[in-house]
Regions:
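Active-site histidine-anchored catalytic micro-motif
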Residues: 150
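Short conserved active-site loop signatures built around small residues
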Residues: 147
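Short, high-confidence coil segments that cap the C-terminus of an alpha-helix
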Residues: 162-166
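Conserved "HGTGT" condensation-loop signature of ketosynthase/thiolase-family condensing enzymes
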Residues: 1-89, 94-135, 156-159, 169-170, ...
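Short loop-beta-helix segment that forms the pyridoxal 5′-phosphate
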Residues: 136-142
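Structured core elements
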Residues: 139, 167-168
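Substrate-binding strand-loop-helix patch
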Residues: 175-179
């Protein structure tokens, strides 16, 4: 967050040429890539990182930072603490990698974590487990409207007394990289 905020105040743009793969032959060559993300450095253990797609790791990292910054941890009853974290599409990179394994190497090579890693609701579920948030847990999936929809639903849940606090947001995972 400090790096991001510092870049904002210095007028540094976060969008640049794609560096994660060769864009030759692609019309789109620009993206807002997250640089140097290390799940362990933000508190996600290695085993968890191996079982979660990058979009869910981004969600967990953001939730951990938001909860730490808010000072709310331990101050809300677990049954009144919710998680509304959506995803426009889920773990696209995992989907691409595991589909390629299936087609090129056969079904026995597909990870048993394929579905749990890629489905969009896993980010919300993992965050709820991590913070013992036993209140409402809603993974909103409404394409490009997911961010606004998620925040609106979280607001509504608090307004109508379904929860006292809700972690709300939407992670954006990396683009699906072609297999080299």
């Amino acid at each position: 967050a400090k790096t991001f905020f510092g870049s904002l105040t210095r007028g540094v743009c976060g969008v640049g040429r794609i560096t994660r793969f060769d864009t030759t032959g692609y019309k789109a060559t620009l993206a807002a890539e997250v640089k140097d993300f290390d799940p362990e450095a933000v508190g996600i253990d290695r085993a968890q990182a191996k079982r979660t797609d990058l979009f869910a790791q981004y969600a967990m990292a953001a939730a951990m930072q938001a909860v730490a910054d808010s000072g709310i941890e331990g101050r809300v009853a677990p049954e009144r603490f919710g998680v509304y974290v959506g995803s426009g599409i889920g773990g696209m990179q995992t989907f691409v990698q595991e589909t390629e394994k299936l087609l090129n190497r056969g079904p026995t090579r597909v990870s048993p974590f394929f579905i749990p890693m890629m489905i969009g609701n896993m980010a919300a579920g993992n965050i709820a487990i991590h913070f013992n948030a036993q209140g409402p847990c809603l993974p909103v999936v409404t394409a490009c409207a997911t961010s606004s929809h998620t925040i609106g639903e979280a607001f509504r849940a608090i307004k109508y007394g379904h929860a006292d606090a809700i972690i709300a947001g939407v992670p954006m995972g990396r683009m699906a990289e072609p297999d080299d």
